[in-house]
Amino acid sequence: MQLSHLLLAFAMIFVMTIMYAPQVQADAWADANADADVNCEVTPYHPDCRGVMP
């Protein structure tokens, strides 16, 4: 009986991991995109900064 409870616990952990993983990946992509924004004060000659800085 203990083995079936252990298998049930692992199955629940596995299912919860599968359900939670896409949200973690989406958050990671959002953070990476926010970090990738060009800082025109640091790199004023970057092509994305044309017309932003004098």
Swiss-Prot record:
Modifications made to the protein after synthesis: Contains 1 disulfide bond.
Taxonomy, superkingdom: Eukaryota
Location of this chain's protein in the cell: Secreted
Annotated GO CC locations: extracellular region
Transmembrane segments: none
Residues in the signal sequence: 1-26
Pfam families named among the record's database cross-references: Pilosulin (PF17499)
GO molecular function per UniProt: toxin activity
Keywords assigned: Disulfide bond, Secreted, Signal, Toxin
Keyword Disulfide bond: yes
Record propeptide residues: 27-38
Main location: secreted
Entry comment describing in which tissues the protein is expressed: Expressed by the venom gland.
Alphabetized InterPro entries for the sequence: Pilosulin
Disulphides: none
Similarity remark: Belongs to the formicidae venom precursor-01 superfamily.
Official protein name in the record: U-myrmicitoxin(01)-Tb5a
Annotated source species: Tetramorium bicarinatum (Tramp ant)
